[in-house]
Amino acid sequence: METELLNIEKVSPEEKAAALKKAGEIIREGGLVAFPTETVYGLGADALNAEASAKIYAAKGRPSDNPLIVHIHDVDQVYEIASEVPEAAKKVMEKFWPGPLTVILNKKSCVPDGTTGGLKTVAIRMPSHPLARDFIRESGRMIAAPSANTSGRPSPTLASHVYEDMQGRIPLILDGGAVGIGIESTIIDMSTDTSTILRPGYITKDMLEEVLPKVNIDPAVTGRTMKKNVVAKAPGMKYRHYAPKGQLTLVEGDRDKVIAKINELVKEKEEEGHKVGVIGTDETLDSYHADILRSIGSRQKPETVAANLYRILREFDDLECDYMYSESFFEQGLGNAIMNRMLKAAGYHLITL
């Protein structure tokens, strides 16, 4: 299969319309299209077509019990696929949609088990990226979409990342430039009387509690070991995710001790002949001694850290780093989501000083 890469960001209205029309036709025919959202690039198919959803799992090499998120362009579409929409869910959708929040509700029978990983619930999101909503609208379908990377790898934040993983596996990639947020949406389970965060993201617990009386966090989110014998109620809960090809290790503790430890580890691995990368911050990068150094952003601006994370992990892959070391981040607000992704990317390799 030949994979076409179509730019829809800086083109004429006619060229954009033609690209979206082509993408919509592929979806209606049961095919796959990669498209930009405000979080990461998604790999989309007709959510109500079980055969189309199965193609997503095949293209990614994704376990079939790992549910997909259904992307919509209009809030009224929720009522087509959810058997009930609690008042609390309506408040959350009104406040945070369109945006980087996925809401889990009990599903109607029209949603195939192949889309939900065999669950009786459905994960729904209305993205804020205008190109994503234009694509969904043009397709005339609701779009099931995980991140557009091969399973387990760092999520794509550029169309070139998608092409690297999906070339020859899908017919079309819509190139909308760099995404804004850089990590996947927050997922909140509202299928029961209790509202529970199953995956942290840009929308934080504190933000959700501005409209909900209480929000719980699933223990799997804050855990520091991989839980294997669990039901994956949401994407990212059960399997290794976001991982570079080399071994990433996080180091946490007092700043000066962390820097000293990372420099010690780098020296040890470089003397063994390995290629080593270090992830620092704007505030600490000059303190490290390694051939390959990258600043992930500023601790004062955690949104920059989130936006750069997957890009840097992919850069280290391109540079064929055997080992990577990174500072850890304070687990509060957006830092919860950052550490959740980094721990999974590291396979929970963490040194605490």
Q: Which residues does each predicted region cover?
A:
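Active-site-adjacent structural elements in enzyme catalytic cores
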Residues: 1-353
